Amino acid sequence: MRLAPGQTAVVTGAAGGIGLAMARRFAAEGLTVVLADVEEAALRKAAAELAADGARVLARTVDVGDRDSVLALADAAYEAFGAVHVLCNNAGVGSGAEGRMWEHEPNDWKWAFSVNVWGVFHGIQAFVPRMIAGGAPGHVVNTSSADGGIAPLPTASVYAVTKAAVVTMTESLYAHLKAEGAAVGASVLFPGPHMLRTGLWESHRNRPERYAKERPRRTPYRSLDQYEAAMKQAGHEVNFTPVEEVAEHVVDGIRAGRFWMLPPSEHSDRQIRARSQSMLDRADPAYLESFILD
């Protein structure tokens, strides 16, 4: 798909991190950008920054786990600009779950699924029919993760399960768009190949009351800085991928019509091969990993 001025891109989770980097990159291509996020103050700041740089911007406070909120976002985008050409279902959270799976609070799962899975589905339902009906080339990018999207991560099982669901959902979306003969493409994004400095580690700041934890955490929430310090203390250097690099990967992938937005990585390739071989061999999953601090 060719990206050009006059087109409109919608990005959820756009107030910071990967989402804001994608919005900046689309704006640099001359696209109008619609920013959606649950954090109102950060959203206003992001929109003001882009507008000051000359971008055409619409910002809306949105809870992607609420279908009506996402439908209202679509209505606002189409009312303001008449069409949407790129949709990035990017909003995501960590669950805050502790301990073994059978010890998790149901609300940890409900909240993570509300944002990471239902949020993507709500975006698809709200925008894709209109994008198809418009007849112009378009593209949908759904953000997954190597943690779950490539192979399970048992020590972050809730998050990993949601990101695995995003991969399968996007594969199904791709097939449905092809069967429809639509001019709209689909991709699944695996940000990386290294760690990213985003607000994911502090997701609990946005946890809604309806999904509140039923009991206090046994340990405090850990920050990315604390994780990095613990890794260094254990003798492991943590590598980071700039969010701008992820945004560039997205733009390149849209232009190429690439389904798997998966950056080159020997580690990812090993995980893909190991998991596939385990299935072919009907063998136990010896490839499962754990992270320090989990």
Feature locations, PLM:
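Active-site loop of short-chain dehydrogenase/reductase
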Residues: 6-7, 56, 83-84, 131-145, ...
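SDR active-site lid
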Residues: 179-261
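Substrate-binding pocket helix/loop in short-chain dehydrogenase/reductase
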Residues: 98-101, 105-110
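Canonical Rossmann dinucleotide-binding motif of NAD(H)/NADP(H)-dependent dehydrogenases/reductases
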Residues: 2-34
